Amino acid sequence: MDRVFINLHLVSMVNKQQTGSDGYQVVKDVMIGVRNGKVEYVGEPCPSILHGHPDIIDCAHALVTPGFIDCHTHLIFAGNRANEFEQRLQGIPYEEIAKQGGGILSTVQATREASEDELYHLAVHRLEGLKRDGVTTIEIKSGYGLTLDDEIKMLKVVKRISELPDMKVSSTLLAAHAVPPEYKNRSDEYIDLICDTIIPQVVKLNLANHVDVFCEGIGFSTKQCERVFRTALKHGLRIKGHTEQLSNLGGSALAAAMGADSVDHIEYLDEHGVKALTKNNTVATLLPGAFYFLKETKLPPIALLRQYEVPMAIATDFNPGTSPIASLRTIMNMACTLFKLTPEESLRGVTCHAAQALGLQNFRGKIAVGMEADFAIWQLESPAELSYRLGVPDLIARVVDGEIFHEK
């Protein structure tokens, strides 16, 4: 062993079939052995594990969970839209704000004007809040460039962030986020650019794991999204979708049928769509931050998702317009208070189910032999406190590939 963690209380998130427990209950006085960045032992204290003089970390009866995974973010952008926040509070509708040059296209303009270095430093600063909440893996999307060069610029920033030693990154191409101004009323031609030029070039440069789309009346049609998905799959990329946020176009069922790892937002998802998620083992990613920030009233179909046993992930959806919230624990609380998830569902949503939403369920999101050694060590007594209490610095340290990172 390279490193052994002793005197810890474990919340493994490993399911009943594998352990006989539910993975959420606290198992006291556990030892974890790590070698080459992976978990090699989990169980009762075992003196033989200490042979070879590994580095011993006494957790002093702290609570240990899998490292948190924020599986849906728009972390990279320039500018901010605080002025729009004020306008919305005054009752000005989004459509009017957009006509005045606001909305997503204002972020596109600012992001296009920013250099790669500027975007990198802005994103690294934003990461700090997520780190304090125990995040060890983050998904980051492009989507504020909307040209070949600017989408690649954003994805190069994602790649630079992935080189940080204390954060793992999953990269998503979201060129189909909005129709850029130069393609106004020519969205099919913009889809041509995405499929014929942007996706092949991103694959050539190895800059993305997934391709995402915004399937909505104000975004792209199911026919257009299907074409993007087919192109992505043909080039060996995984797929996911922003679907059923504002209306029910059938984007979730389409994405699931094509093998999507997750569909996200899903406030308007119906039973047909839920059945499609079950059939194709697609994760439903809930984004309560956007629901809260936009003062929406249409709740996701939580009862149906439970009935059909669809895994539910939750994420910050961190972005400048509709969820400028860099706190995954705040989002966990919102998932409970706004969407009526239980604290257990909330914790699964940022660990094992979030890993599945990124296609990483065999590597992260649980603490078990063979998994990557990504943990969060908390000064807490029970896992329910993670959703219950906000603003208190409960995190002692994050562990990424077995390396320890103490938070400021």
Swiss-Prot record:
Its main location: cytoplasm. GO terms for molecular function: imidazolonepropionase activity; iron ion binding; zinc ion binding. NCBIfam families: hutI. This is Imidazolonepropionase. The lineage of its organism: Bacteria, Pseudomonadati, Pseudomonadota, Gammaproteobacteria, Vibrionales. SUPFAM superfamilies: Composite domain of metallo-dependent hydrolases, Metallo-dependent hydrolases. Binds 1 zinc or iron ion per subunit. It holds the Pfam family Amidohydro_1. Zn(2+) binds at H72, H74, H242, D317. Belongs to the metallo-dependent hydrolases superfamily. HutI family. Catalyzes the hydrolytic cleavage of the carbon-nitrogen bond in imidazolone-5-propanoate to yield N-formimidoyl-L-glutamate. It is the third step in the universal histidine degradation pathway. CDD domains: Imidazolone-5PH. It comes from the Bacteria. It comes from Aliivibrio fischeri (strain MJ11). 4-imidazolone-5-propanoate binds at R81, Y144, H177, Q245, T322. Its EC number is 3.5.2.7.
